[in-house]
A protein has these predicted regions:
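A short Gly-Trp-Pro
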Residues: 1-7, 12-99
């Protein structure tokens, strides 16, 4: 497994996670993911670590409230969230992972 890092646009929220280099990316057709062209990379909770910016995270829920969408209070980017489809994983926005 390889360690990756990423975060929001302004850099206030940062995270690290471990994943196989051949991990599969998913597209979602829910209303919020389609609007922002969110590319999903599901990472188990124990392989994810929020490294900075916890106090700058704003949570948004809708409909069933089972998915927890986390946004940066400063720049508005959703770099990861808790999907309802994978309760044991976070969904990392692939476009928010560092090169």
């Amino acid at each position: 497994m390889k360690e990756y890092t990423g975060g929001c646009h302004c850099g206030a929220i940062r995270f690290a996670f471990h994943s196989e280099e051949s991990a599969q990316m998913w597209k979602c057709n829910c209303s919020i993911c389609e609007m922002i062209d969110y590319d999903h990379l599901f990472i188990k909770h124990d392989l994810f670590k929020l490294t900075s910016g916890k106090e700058l995270i704003e949570k948004y829920v809708f409909e069933t409230e089972s998915a927890k969408h986390y946004f940066c209070k400063l720049c508005g980017i959703k770099s990861f969230y808790q999907p309802r489809s994978h309760p044991d994983s976070y969904s990392i926005h692939l476009k928010c992972v560092d090169d």
